[in-house]
Amino acid sequence: MALPLIKPKESEESHLALLSKIHVSKNWKLPPRLPHRAAQRRKRVHRLHEDYETEENDEELQKKKRQNRDAQRAYRERKNNKLQVLEETIESLSKVVKNYETKLNRLQNELQAKESENHALKQKLETLTLKQASVPAQDPILQNLIENFKPMKAIPIKYNTAIKRHQHSTELPSSVKCGFCNDNTTCVCKELETDHRKSDDGVATEQKDMSMPHAECNNKDNPNGLCSNCTNIDKSCIDIRSIIH
């Protein structure tokens, strides 16, 4: 049995030297290196993520736009409502102002009329005051009594003997002194008493004459000397001539 021939292992240097000596008859172009699939997958995921974020951003943007439109619409509505309320308020206040102006003008005219009337009344009062000052004042009660005076029927006066008796009973005797006078002076009290007695006698005589019945008296037997006609002024039996004389 023959043994194989074992040759020594060639070194790498010799192998490289051999390769460098090889000459290629054609120029070959190596194709570009293709990207790795993982890198492509990452790029695709990144692109999808960007697209998703763009869509989300678009939705948020649209939502914000809708909110802005709604807010602007609500603001315009509130503004229009407020303007309408203000216009109505201005209109009502204008009516109130016109009413007050009309009332003010009317009151001013009334005030002028009252002032004119007051001035005229003051002048009239001054005139009447001057007239009343020139005329003597008269009591209104007395004036009323004079205007409404009604004469009364005459009543016969009866002589009262009791009064005369009382007067004679009150007379002081001549011997009694008043206590203020003496024998050497004139007593004033006695003189006054004498004058008073004379006046009482005159009144009694006049009353007696007035009570005397007329010749045509129907009741001469009456102790008073009067009849039913004596008390009637229209049918009196008293002689007026005796009273006058």
Curated annotation (Swiss-Prot):
Comp. bias (Basic and acidic residues): 68-77
SUPFAM superfamilies: Leucine zipper domain
Subunit structure: Homodimer.
GO BP annotations listed: cellular response to iron ion; negative regulation of transcription by RNA polymerase II; positive regulation of transcription by RNA polymerase II
Main location: cytoplasm
Comp. bias intervals (Basic residues): 34-47
An example Gene Ontology molecular-function term: DNA-binding transcription factor activity, RNA polymerase II-specific
Similarity annotation: Belongs to the bZIP family. YAP subfamily.
Annotated stretches, region: Leucine-zipper: 86-114
Residue ranges occupied by any bZIP domain in the UniProt entry: 58-121
UniProt function note: Transcription activator involved in the regulation of genes expressed in response to environmental changes and metabolic requirements. According to genome-wide promoter binding and gene expression studies it is a coregulator for the expression of ribosomal genes, while its own expression is induced by the cell cycle specific activator SBF (SWI4-SWI6).
Lineage: Eukaryota, Fungi, Dikarya, Ascomycota, Saccharomycotina
Source organism (scientific name): Saccharomyces cerevisiae (strain ATCC 204508 / S288c)
Keywords: Activator, Cytoplasm, DNA-binding, Nucleus, Transcription, Transcription regulation
GO CC terms in record: chromatin; cytoplasm; nucleus
InterPro entries listed in its UniProt record: AP-1-like, bZIP, bZIP_sf
Location in the cell: Cytoplasm; Nucleus
Basic motif: annotated segments: 63-82
Protein's name in the database: AP-1-like transcription factor YAP5
Region (Disordered): 34-77
Gene: YAP5
Extra remark beyond the main annotation: One of 8 closely related fungi-specific YAP proteins (YAP1 to YAP8), which all seem to be transcription activators of the environmental stress response and metabolism control pathways and to have similar but not identical DNA binding specificities.
